């Protein structure tokens, strides 16, 4: 699947990216290169291969599930611009 210039323009519009005329060919080529790599990976036969979450057979050392620091909510809320009932109040950004 190859992207056309119009596809890249539409994607840029949806992502609210301001691309100029000089950038469009470079971005189109870069995206097509990425999609080509994805096509190559999808073409590989992986039948019988067990999926891996991590390429190495290692495990994470877990620490005990204990509280390691004190509750500092009151201290943080004392310096916050606006709080109410233990919550931080922020300006509305979406109508």
Curated annotation (Swiss-Prot):
GO molecular function, one term: ATP binding
InterPro entries in the cross-refs: Asp/Glu-ADT_sf_sub_c, GatC
Keywords of this entry: ATP-binding, Ligase, Nucleotide-binding, Protein biosynthesis
Catalytic function, reaction form: L-glutamyl-tRNA(Gln) + L-glutamine + ATP + H2O = L-glutaminyl-tRNA(Gln) + L-glutamate + ADP + phosphate + H(+); L-aspartyl-tRNA(Asn) + L-glutamine + ATP + H2O = L-asparaginyl-tRNA(Asn) + L-glutamate + ADP + phosphate + 2 H(+)
E.C. number(s) listed in UniProt: 6.3.5.-
Subunit structure: Heterotrimer of A, B and C subunits.
Function, in words: Allows the formation of correctly charged Asn-tRNA(Asn) or Gln-tRNA(Gln) through the transamidation of misacylated Asp-tRNA(Asn) or Glu-tRNA(Gln) in organisms which lack either or both of asparaginyl-tRNA or glutaminyl-tRNA synthetases. The reaction takes place in the presence of glutamine and ATP through an activated phospho-Asp-tRNA(Asn) or phospho-Glu-tRNA(Gln).
Protein name: Aspartyl/glutamyl-tRNA(Asn/Gln) amidotransferase subunit C
Record gene name: gatC
């Amino acid at each position: 699947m190859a992207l056309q210039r119009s596809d890249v323009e539409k994607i840029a519009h949806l992502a609210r990216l301001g691309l100029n005329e000089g950038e469009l060919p470079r971005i189109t080529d870069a995206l097509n290169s990425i999609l080509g790599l994805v096509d190559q990976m999808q073409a590989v036969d992986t039948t019988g291969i067990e999926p891996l979450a991590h390429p190495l057979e290692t495990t994470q050392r877990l620490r005990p599930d204990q509280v390691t620091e004190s509750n500092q909510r009151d201290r943080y809320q004392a310096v916050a611009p606006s709080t109410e009932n233990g919550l931080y109040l922020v300006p509305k950004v979406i109508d």
